[in-house]
UniProtKB/Swiss-Prot annotation:
Protein name listed in UniProt: Proline--tRNA ligase
Pfam families: HGTP_anticodon, tRNA-synt_2b, tRNA_edit
Function: Catalyzes the attachment of proline to tRNA(Pro) in a two-step reaction: proline is first activated by ATP to form Pro-AMP and then transferred to the acceptor end of tRNA(Pro). As ProRS can inadvertently accommodate and process non-cognate amino acids such as alanine and cysteine, to avoid such errors it has two additional distinct editing activities against alanine. One activity is designated as 'pretransfer' editing and involves the tRNA(Pro)-independent hydrolysis of activated Ala-AMP.
Family, as annotated: Belongs to the class-II aminoacyl-tRNA synthetase family. ProS type 1 subfamily.
Places the protein is found: Cytoplasm
Domain remark text: Consists of three domains: the N-terminal catalytic domain, the editing domain and the C-terminal anticodon-binding domain.
Keywords associated with the record: Aminoacyl-tRNA synthetase, ATP-binding, Cytoplasm, Ligase, Nucleotide-binding, Protein biosynthesis
Subunit structure: Homodimer.
EC number: 6.1.1.15
Organism: Paraburkholderia phymatum (strain DSM 17167 / CIP 108236 / LMG 21445 / STM815)
Length: 578
């Protein structure tokens, strides 16, 4: 490939709306251009990297036994109504009517369509298992698209859907996809972690997310540096921080805390550790034809409520936060001084695991400007219902017992789900088992954000000059920079020879024959992020040398002319083998 025959659209400045590094660099490197909010053109440089990501994904999906197909981006509303997601999926689902006033959607995901395929084509257990996948453009009408391709509205995704006859089969399909994802993200050259996760709006049971580790990530990842444990913070089990409850040492005492409505202010006023205070969170659940049930959830003052965990507790599946009017009716005081003692009306109390093992703690008195100190279970309060209702924190014990938790930020680039029969039962996707009885298919779904991977990779691989691509997804692996290509026969002949040698060896190479000044030429390719650069100049050729510099190298080195091509080939192969 010669640069004069290729489109290079680099910019000196990033657009004003670009907030994170990947967005800035993808625009400046000529990879993307904005069409509308969250919608982008992918220019030739960007498309080359997309195609390389897709190629690796396809290779590993095929290796895992998945079969490629292609489903339509436009889907009829009837399928979504049948699954129940027409009502449940929020405004992110782009809905429209055709000229016949029939309802359609632009697919953000394809569970309904693929289930429709399966129920129409799969009749017997002999046809199972099967795993269909596609690489398709999706649309999700994000309320606030931002960060370039990281949170766009239109995006390219690989989605796969497995169908099995039983749970053992589903678990095996899930394992194959999980292993394939590990291979994919390893080959892409990404620093990633697979973390246990919540299934969210997709539904189902088991779930893992694959996160690229980056400071700009939107998700908090809890992991143990000394073991393999990793989990989304929302899904990580929070163990009790106190192994055994100590005997009471303090008397129950009503204490003045004027204007101290927050745990931090109470701790400072009483000159006690924040860890001795209790945060009271009031929830409500509806009862048909009767007043709501009011719940008091007790957390240590330095801990945060995990709403996903709470939502899974018996009786709290559809909780809401209590209104101030309800709080006053049940507790006799507005928020800020609430606690489980002396409530006006009966409540249900749930204590976090750590709170359940505390002694001599501080709660609100249910009276403005007062708290109660020296509170103890059994003596002052009945033993509570105990549950894990908080987010884990840094230095918490790891749930696997092999160290302590650390927290990092992650960018989700892949997700695998065990759906079970959520869609097959709703849409009557059945097969005949060995005894001739109809059974619902066990489903799994497995997604990878193709375009998001580009942004995530850049967030891990950049410097003040631009992108530093991993070899496997760089738009070009090698750039040849001849000094005076149009003026020197020796330079042109050697550059062309290197180009042909590298191309013959299967290396993705571009020769910059644009006639730009060296500074402009180098700046462009450093911005674009090509991993390897060879500079061919008359002076070096007279000495039998060509200048080589890796994109991560601080200094250039000289290579013998006759060995330069092979040296670069070896470096690329070594990088791809890591």
């Amino acid at each position: 490939m010669k640069a004069s025959r290729f489109f290079i659209g680099t910019l000196k400045e990033a657009p004003a709306d670009a907030e994170i590094v990947s967005h800035k660099l993808m625009v400046r490197a000529g990879m993307i251009r904005r069409v509308a909010g969250g919608i982008y053109n992918y220019l030739p440089i960007g498309l080359r990297s997309i195609r390389k990501v897709e190629a690796i994904v396809r290779e590993e999906m095929n290796r895992a036994g998945a079969i490629e197909l292609l489903m339509p981006a436009v889907q009829p509303a009837e399928l979504w109504q049948e699954s129940g997601r027409w009502e449940k999926y929020g405004p992110e689902l782009l809905r429209f009517k055709d000229r016949k006033q029939s309802d359609f959607v632009i697919g953000p995901t394809h569970e309904e369509v693929v289930t429709d395929i399966a129920r129409g084509q799969i009749k017997s257990y002999r046809q199972l298992p099967v795993n269909f996948y596609q690489v398709q453009t999706k649309f999700r009408d994000e309320i606030r698209p931002r960060f370039g391709v990281m949170r766009g509205r239109e995006f390219i995704m690989k989605d796969a859907y497995s169908f099995d006859k039983d749970m053992d089969g589903l678990r095996e399909s899930y394992r194959k996809m999980y292993d394939a994802y590990v291979r994919i993200f390893t080959r892409l050259g990404l620093d990633f972690r697979a973390v246990a996760a919540d299934n969210g709006s997709i539904g189902g049971s088991g779930s893992h997310e694959f996160h690229v580790i980056a400071d700009t990530g939107e998700d908090d990842i809890a992991y143990c540096p000394t073991s393999d444990f990793a989990s989304n913070v929302e899904a990580a089990e929070a163990l009790p921080l106190i192994a055994e409850r100590a005997a009471p040492k303090e008397e129950l005492r009503k204490t003045s805390t004027p204007g101290k409505a927050k745990c931090e202010a109470v701790a400072e006023h009483l000159n006690i550790p924040l860890e001795k205070t209790i945060k009271s969170i009031i929830l409500a659940t509806e009862n048909e034809g009767a007043e709501p049930t009011i719940w008091l959830l007790m957390l240590r003052g330095d801990h945060d409520l995990n709403e996903i965990k709470v939502n899974k507790l018996p009786g709290l599946g559809e909780f809401r936060f209590a209104t101030e009017e309800e709080i006053v009716e049940w507790f006799g005081t507005p928020p800020g001084y609430l606690g489980p003692l002396n409530t006006k009306k009966p409540i249900k109390v749930i204590a976090d695991r750590t709170v359940a093992n505390m002694s001599d703690f501080v709660v609100g008195t249910n009276e403005v400007d007062f708290h109660t100190t020296g509170v103890n279970w059994g003596r002052d309060l009945p033993e509570p219902v105990v549950a894990d209702i908080r987010n884990v924190k840094k230095d918490d014990p790891s749930p696997d017992g092999k160290g302590v938790i650390d927290i990092c930020r992650g960018i989700e680039v892949g997700h695998v789900f065990q759906l079970g029969t959520k869609y097959s039962e709703a849409m009557n996707a059945t097969f005949l088992d060995e005894s001739g009885k109809p059974q619902p298919m066990q489903m799994g779904c497995y997604g990878i954000g193709i375009t998001r991977i580009l942004g995530a990779a850049i967030e891990q691989n950049f410097d003040d000059k631009g992108i530093i691509w991993p070899e496997s997804i760089a738009p070009f692996e090698v750039v040849l920079c001849p000094m005076g290509y149009d003026r020197s026969d020796a330079v042109r002949e050697q550059a062309d020879k290197l180009h042909d040698e590298l191309t013959a060896a299967g290396i993705d190479v571009i020769l910059d024959d644009r006639g730009e000044r060296p500074g402009v030429m180098f700046a462009d390719w450093e911005l674009i992020g090509v991993p390897h650069r060879l500079v061919i100049g008359e002076r070096g050729l007279k000495d039998g040398k060509i200048e080589y510099q890796g994109r991560r190298d601080a200094e250039a080195t000289l290579l013998p002319v006759e060995a330069a091509a092979q040296a670069v080939i070896d470096k690329i192969h070594a990088a791809l083998a890591r």
